[in-house]
Amino acid sequence: MKHLLKMSDLSPAELHHILDVAEELKAEQKAGTTPALLKGRSVALMFSKNSTRTRTSFEVGVYQLGGLGNYMNAATELQSGRGEPLKDTARVLGRYYDCVVWRTYRQSDLEEFAELAGVPVINGLTDYAHPCQVLADLMTIRERRGTLEGQKLCFIGDGCSMANSLIVGGLLAGMRVTCVCPEGYRPAADVLMFAHRYGEKFHLLTAPAEGVKDADVVVTAAWNTAPGTPESERRLRDFAGFQVTGRLMEGAKPDAMLLHCLPAHRGEEISAAVFEEHADEIFDEAENRLHVQKAVLAILLAGL
C-alpha cells in the first residue's frame, strides 16, 4: 500500500491487515504500551473542509505514535487558498513531511496531489470517498460480530462518499451489501461497475423497508448538509421516507447494529430514539477512527 485514496486501492488482504493492526494498537493503547512507531516522523494534516473527528483523531493518533502532526487550513492558512497551484503545494509539502492527510472536495485533486508529493497521501474525505471512516465501520462490525464474512450490511441514504466507500469496502471484506438511495442519488458509476462483479452479494434499491430486511448492520449518514437552502428543501422532499426509525429497524435482524459516521441530524436521516438506542455502537465507531488511522499511518510509515 503506497497511499490510501479510496477503498479500491486495497486488496482484501490489505484491508484485513489494517483491521488487524488497528486492533493491536487499540489493545496496546488500553494497556498503556503504545509503541513510538512514528518517532522522528512528521505528518501534514491539510484540511480544505471543517472537521471534528477526522482532524482530532489524526492529531491524537500521530501524537500517540510519537510523531509530529501539523494541522493547516488549506483555504485560509496556505498559499493554495490564494491561487498557488496544487502541483506546487504537493511538491513542497512532500519535501517537508513524511505523509500528508488531505480533506478536500475533488477526488481528482487528491489523486493529482498523491502523484506529485512523493510521500504517502491519505484521504481524509473527498466528495467521492471516505476510506478512513469505512475502515472504522468495518473494525466496529468485526469487533462486535467476530467476523465480516457473510454479514448483511444495508446503507440507507445519499449515494455519496460514504456509500461509495461502504460498497467497495464491504464487498472486499466478504460482506453482502445493499445500498438504498432515492432515484437521482445513486452511487458513482465506477463503484456500481465494481459492485456488480460480485453478483448477488450486491443490491441497489430505492425502498428502505426492502433493503433492511434481515440486515445484520444498518448504516446511515447525513444527507442534508446545507440547511436553509433550496438544495436542502429539495433533499427534504426527495429523502422523505428514508429516515432510519424504530419501525424501519424492525425489519432488520433483532440484534442488528446501527452505525452513523456523524454528525447526526436527528429527525432527518435518523430518529433521536434510534440514535440513542445504538449510541454505544456509534461512539465505538467514532473511537475506532483513531485506531484505524493509526494503523494506516503505521503501515505506510513504519512498515507494519
Q: What is the predicted role of each segment?
A:
Residues 1-56, 60:
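Positively charged, low-complexity intrinsically disordered leader regions
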Residues 42-43, 47-96:
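Active-site cofactor/substrate anionic-group-binding motifs, chiefly glycine-
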Residues 48-60, 143-221:
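Glycine-rich phosphate/diphosphate-binding loop of Rossmann-like nucleotide-binding domains
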Residues 70-93, 116, 166-169, 186-200:
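Active-site-proximal loop->helix
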Residues 81, 98-169, 260:
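Anion-binding alpha/beta catalytic cores of soluble intermediary-metabolism enzymes, centered on
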Residues 196-273:
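Rossmann-like adenosine-cofactor binding region
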Residues 255-256, 261-304:
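Adenosine-phosphate binding glycine-rich loop
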